């Protein structure tokens, strides 16, 4: 099938527009006669910058307006960072494709220090995520962790203005915006296990648009899809959202998936880890199996305590 016109819904931040233009380019290469437009939109998540995501409704704030555009036909597809997509999509929507993953790890950015280990007692580190906060507090209890919101450029400006001694950002976002030069170090899995889906782009459509599944199929990357499926299954099984310090990272080798999961308390006092392996065709079951291991170690009680504290 060769579509005549496709409209991509996207947030208007530089990073979101880079992602939309990347998919636009892929679609134009696949379907040279197709007109591919981008519909830029401002979401609630972009507007509320004075509170952490965990306090204002979570990651769904970044996708609701885009889903409305899919629902009412103004757009055919929406491009998201998968880590910003809620684990359960609203009824009537589906992820039609998951693109090949870029760098899944977190980046340490600082004008004063080259490594986290160098930072002295009381140094201020900015992060937008409870997941990062829990892991940083556990490994570096002498550091002061403070909330950081805004787009990539806003966060870098806050660092440059001296509000923070260092900040932690997703490496993929910096690399996509050609800001690699700001990265002092890529954080290891032991320092900061990534969020479910980190580094991967997802393409969402209205579920009834049967015509689009085949059109978007060439954009799907099988290995990334399997890994992200496992990660999201783990997070879904534990009620994962940005209100919970939860990490999930899956790798693949010769058809075998290895999934590592983590749940922590934001103060770093408790960090639970679990892992398991399974063939790629059992990605969803693998996610649920690692979630059960974490639950058996007390993850549900820990998550309940965190949510009670947040609320």
Curated annotation (Swiss-Prot):
One of its GO terms (biological process) is protoporphyrinogen IX biosynthetic process. Its EC number is 2.5.1.61. InterPro entries: HemC, Porphobilin_deaminase_cofac_BS, Porphobilin_deaminase_N, Porphobilinogen_deaminase_C, Porphobilinogen_deaminase_C_sf. Pathway: Porphyrin-containing compound metabolism; protoporphyrin-IX biosynthesis; coproporphyrinogen-III from 5-aminolevulinate: step 2/4. One of its GO terms (cellular component) is cytoplasm. The keyword Transferase applies. The modification S-(dipyrrolylmethanemethyl)cysteine is found at residue 242. Transmembrane segments: none annotated. Its cofactor is dipyrromethane. Keywords: Porphyrin biosynthesis, Transferase. It catalyses: 4 porphobilinogen + H2O = hydroxymethylbilane + 4 NH4(+). The keyword Transferase applies. Binds 1 dipyrromethane group covalently. GO terms for molecular function: hydroxymethylbilane synthase activity. The porphobilinogen subunits are added to the dipyrromethane group. Monomer. Tetrapolymerization of the monopyrrole PBG into the hydroxymethylbilane pre-uroporphyrinogen in several discrete steps. Belongs to the HMBS family. This is Porphobilinogen deaminase. It comes from Neisseria meningitidis serogroup B (strain ATCC BAA-335 / MC58).
């Amino acid at each position: 099938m060769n579509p005549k016109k496709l409209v991509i819904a996207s947030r208007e931040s530089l990073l979101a527009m880079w992602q939309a233009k990347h998919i636009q380019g892929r679609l134009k290469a696949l379907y040279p006669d197709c007109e591919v437009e981008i519909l830029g939109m401002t979401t609630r998540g972009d507007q509320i910058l004075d509170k952490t995501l965990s306090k204002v409704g979570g990651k769904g704030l970044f996708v609701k307006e885009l889903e409305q555009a899919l629902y009412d036909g103004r757009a055919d597809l929406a491009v998201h960072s998968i880590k910003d997509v809620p684990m359960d999509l609203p009824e009537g929507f589906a992820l039609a494709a998951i693109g090949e993953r870029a760098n899944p790890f977190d980046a340490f950015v600082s004008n004063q220090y080259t490594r986290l280990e160098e930072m002295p007692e009381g140094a201020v580190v900015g992060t937008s995520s409870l997941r990062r906060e829990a892991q940083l507090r556990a490994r570096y209890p002498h550091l002061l962790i403070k909330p950081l919101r805004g787009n990539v450029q806003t966060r870098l400006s806050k660092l440059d203005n001296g509000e923070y001694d260092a900040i932690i950002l997703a490496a993929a976002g910096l690399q996509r915006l050609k800001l690699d030069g700001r990265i002092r170090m890529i954080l290891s899995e032991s320092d900061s296990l990534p969020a479910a889906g980190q580094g991967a782009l997802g393409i969402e459509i209205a579920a009834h648009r049967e015509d689009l599944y085949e059109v978007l199929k060439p954009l799907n990357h099988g290995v990334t899809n399997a890994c992200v499926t496992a990660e999201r299954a783990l997070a879904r099984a534990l009620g994962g959202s940005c209100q919970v310090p939860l990490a999930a990272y899956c790798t693949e080798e010769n058809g075998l998936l290895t999934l590592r999961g983590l749940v922590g308390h934001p103060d770093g006092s408790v960090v639970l880890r679990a892992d398991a392996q399974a063939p790629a065709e059992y990605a969803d079951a693998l996610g649920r199996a690692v979630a059960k291991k974490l639950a058996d170690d007390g993850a549900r009680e820990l998550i309940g305590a965190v949510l009670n504290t947040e609320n």
